[in-house]
From Swiss-Prot:
<dbReference type="GO" id="GO:0045087">
    <property type="term" value="P:innate immune response"/>
</dbReference>
<keyword id="KW-0391">Immunity</keyword>
<keyword id="KW-0399">Innate immunity</keyword>
<feature type="modified residue" description="Lysine amide">
    <location>
        <position position="17"/>
    </location>
</feature>
<comment type="function">
    <text>Antimicrobial peptide. Is able to kill Mycobacterium abscessus subsp. massiliense in a dose-dependent manner. Has antifungal activity against Candida spp. and one Cryptococcus neoformans strains with MICs values ranging from 12.5 to 100 uM. Shows low cytotoxic activity and low hemolytic activity on human erythrocytes. Shows anti-inflammatory activities, since it decreases release of pro-inflammatory cytokines, and increases release of anti-inflammatory cytokines. Acts by blocking the Toll-like receptor 4 (TLR4).</text>
</comment>
<dbReference type="GO" id="GO:0005576">
    <property type="term" value="C:extracellular region"/>
</dbReference>
<keyword id="KW-0929">Antimicrobial</keyword>
<dbReference type="GO" id="GO:0042742">
    <property type="term" value="P:defense response to bacterium"/>
</dbReference>
<keyword id="KW-0044">Antibiotic</keyword>
<keyword id="KW-0295">Fungicide</keyword>
<keyword id="KW-0027">Amidation</keyword>
<comment type="similarity">
    <text>Belongs to the non-disulfide-bridged peptide (NDBP) superfamily. Short antimicrobial peptide (group 4) family.</text>
</comment>
<keyword id="KW-0964">Secreted</keyword>
<dbReference type="GO" id="GO:0031640">
    <property type="term" value="P:killing of cells of another organism"/>
</dbReference>
<dbReference type="GO" id="GO:0050832">
    <property type="term" value="P:defense response to fungus"/>
</dbReference>
<protein>
    <recommendedName>
        <fullName>Antimicrobial peptide ToAP3</fullName>
    </recommendedName>
</protein>
Length: 17
């Protein structure tokens, strides 16, 4: 779960950009 958080954040940033 902990390692999953950075992936979600990175995905959101990539989606926004």
């Amino acid at each position: 779960f902990i390692g999953m958080i950075p992936g979600l954040i990175g995905g959101l940033i990539s989606a926004i950009k």
